[in-house]
Amino acid sequence: MGYDVTEYMARYLRGETDIPMRRHRVLAVTCADSSRWIVDAGIGQAAFRRPLPFAEGAERTINGETYHVVKKDFYGWVIEDWHNGAWRPFYGFTEEVQLNLDYIMPSFWCEKHPDSPFTKANMLSIKTDTGRCTLDGNTFRCFDGDTVTEKELTDEEIPSVMDSVFGIRL
């Protein structure tokens, strides 16, 4: 297909005060022209939607959100986003190649461990053409450019929103 994919494991840094475990899959894509790109399926928060150049100092603005790539001694390659007038760390990864089996333990931790943020409440996100919609616990938000709409859902409303917005039928 004209490109090679290498998988890495990242430490999600946004909002962390301690060094977090590696638990996020990141792809590095090398194209036929030797250009390298960082590719990510995303998370439920603001995250880059299109590949970032895999080069120190690279910067890209996507749908009004600006990201850049820096190198740090401990974290390796760090993706940062411009937020409230300052660069905010998003995640960091080193270039240690990962295999599918390397994701089993972090995936299990995310799904089952009592300290995992994913075991505490509903956590869904879907990208839209102009933003994203999220369900975090009972809080439903849609981000459309600079506009955010928010609604606290009742437990009875959640199945309908999961179906109509996220395509999940309970």
Where are these regions (language model features)?
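Hydrophobic/aromatic-rich core segments of domains that either
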Residues: Y3-H68
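N-terminal accessory/pre-domain segments preceding catalytic cores
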Residues: K72-L170
